Amino acid sequence: MSSAQPATGRAAPGGAAAGRAGRHLGLALLVIATAQLMVVLDATIVNVALPHVQRALGFSGTGLEWVVNAYALTFGGLLLLGGRAGDILGRRRVFIAGIILFSVASLLGGFATTQAWLLAARAAQGVGGAIIAPTALSLVTTTFPEGPPRNRAMGVYAAMSIGGAAVGLIAGGLLTTYLSWRWVLFVNVPIGAVVAILAPRAFAESERRPGRFDLPGAITSTLGLAALVYGLTSAATTPNGVSHWGDTKVIASLTAAVVLLVSFVFIESRSPHALMPLRIFRNRNRSAANLIMLCIGTAMFGMFFFLTIFVQTVWGYSALRSGIAFLPMVATIMVMAGVSAQLVPRIGARPLLIAGSAIAGGGMFWLSRITEHSHYVSGLLGPM
């Protein structure tokens, strides 16, 4: 009897503790999902508003690309550094700092009156996103216990990563059509404020790990990619057939890109705290898969940028209609991502990579035939 009493006495508190733990995990999942949605949202929400941004601030065709590039380059170039910062300084602290930076940059970008102002804000958004994304993923693994809770959290994280693109298309169209292009940036401010307020309640601070930042690697890779993109976009042939490959600024930027990227490889081969240890490329399958994803991602970014401008300026679509027009593509990606995950254990990754690359290449070629007289179904929906 005496041994039964302590067990009975602990039952109620145990149930209450379990309830509190459940609420805590629910809040944590809400914060992580919202933060990831906010980061992914900006990959598409601004695209739909690009023609309006161009008219408002007077961007040229090549200059307008940098509204997208400024975000993508800083986000991609500093992503690994953002993850390292969370390990060294504490994940919750760094996560909140990233949210605040992203929100402030969005606010400033919404008030932009010059091209340089908007591009600087977009670059700052990318830095914030590069901090948020890896620390949010780390918080999933440190907050949720292994098993079903963590699996569910990872599923929600992945769903936000994919579904955020669809939300961005619709939200960008609605905000641009009924309010202003500036609201595709302002919308992040209240979302970020809520996440920043709830994050301290949702997460415990992680232990700091000793380590060093690979700043030389982060700087050379980001600047090298920026120089490469600038050189390639500046070298584009104009509509009247004039090529700029021989221009001094093109040659200088491409030379700088080579020097910086070679320096990055050298730094990573010598640094004990390398952001991208070169040994990861010893696995041929992993290297090939990463190369394919690089090619597909590059093509998708270029395609989406071009089509957004095309359907609004040539076909006369509104921002909302263009966002809806791209939804089937996002839906197809979401469905096929689930299908391919089921097929990998059965037939292996290589056949799927080959088939997927071939289908994507065929779709890109089909899209290259689009004209002002093309119909939506045959000219856009089919190849997408």
Question: What name fits each language-model region?
Answer:
Residues 29-74, 180, 245-256, 260, ...:
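Transmembrane core module of solute transporters
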Residues 41, 45, 77, 81, ...:
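Residue positions within transmembrane alpha-helices of multi-pass solute transporters
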Residues 39, 68-71, 75, 102, ...:
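Structural signature of transmembrane alpha-helices in multi-pass secondary transporters
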Residues 52, 83-84, 88, 174, ...:
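Membrane-interface helix termini in secondary transporters
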Residues 1-41, 55:
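Cytosolic juxtamembrane N-terminal segment immediately preceding the first transmembrane helix
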